[in-house]
Amino acid sequence: MGEVKVSPDYNWFRGTVPLKKIIVDDDDSKIWSLYDAGPRSIRCPLIFLPPVSGTADVFFRQILALTGWGYRVIALQYPVYWDHLEFCDGFRKLLDHLQLDKVHLFGASLGGFLAQKFAEYTHKSPRVHSLILCNSFSDTSIFNQTWTANSFWLMPAFMLKKIVLGNFSSGPVDPMMADAIDFMVDRLESLGQSELASRLTLNCQNSYVEPHKIRDIPVTIMDVFDQSALSTEAKEEMYKLYPNARRAHLKTGGNFPYLCRSAEVNLYVQIHLLQFHGTKYAAIDPSMVSAEELEVQKGSLGINQEEQ
């Protein structure tokens, strides 16, 4: 098995951050699993939403780094929900249970789409203060599978896994990306048939984001410019949808940059959250803020962030 699963960082994470399970629906089979780390005094934390293949722990490198810098971070794993409205209603109940009025959301792929749908769903009584959308999309029709969305629940687990694995990089990749793919395959193997079927249904069910409902929310679009499951057209559509978004470009990183390019991803997350420091929506403990340090780090990595 890949290096990530046996790495000291991952083992430290699993040994120190407890996995919590929370039920907020009448149906007690719908269980949210989450890691909640960092200062509980922070009332507007950053919440990570995983892709189809991911579990909450795929963001362990963000949790370790960001909590070390004073941020409160929550990484989630979804219950089995079969449509976007059901997901949004369940997520709202979860935030109520956690007593969080507003949050920042980082969504990867499907997680990014669900983050946008939740912001849209709560636009009259906003719960989302900002969005970071990583390798994400705004319209499920890009996958050309809306016609099969209603039949995923019938398919056996091995077939569903094959569909998901079809989007993983198959060409040559560097060792860190190979390790990330191995880890994600392992995480995929841990998901049951209903979990996978429901996520693929959410990923492909005919739906799109209505931008006018969420146009006032600060957005960072994080894209990778090597092999990823997203087409150039899908990326361009996101830029059009959010013309004022900050753009965080990673030259490489594939589908899972939060695992194999974590230093860059973590830095972009810090840069995004910096705009809220000193407000009641800061995701960081005020005593830990050091903008100068962040600027030095930004310069040393030589990352070019384009704002448009």
Swiss-Prot record:
InterPro entries: AB_hydrolase_1, AB_hydrolase_fold, Maspardin. SUPFAM superfamilies: alpha/beta-Hydrolases. Disulfide bonds: none annotated. Residues 87-159 form the AB hydrolase-1 domain. GO terms for cellular component: cytosol; trans-Golgi network transport vesicle. Pfam families: Abhydrolase_1. One of its GO terms (molecular function) is CD4 receptor binding. Keywords: Cytoplasm. It is found in: Cytoplasm. Its main location: cytoplasm. Signal peptide: none annotated. Belongs to the AB hydrolase superfamily. Interacts with CD4. Interacts with ALDH16A1. May play a role as a negative regulatory factor in CD4-dependent T-cell activation. This is Maspardin.
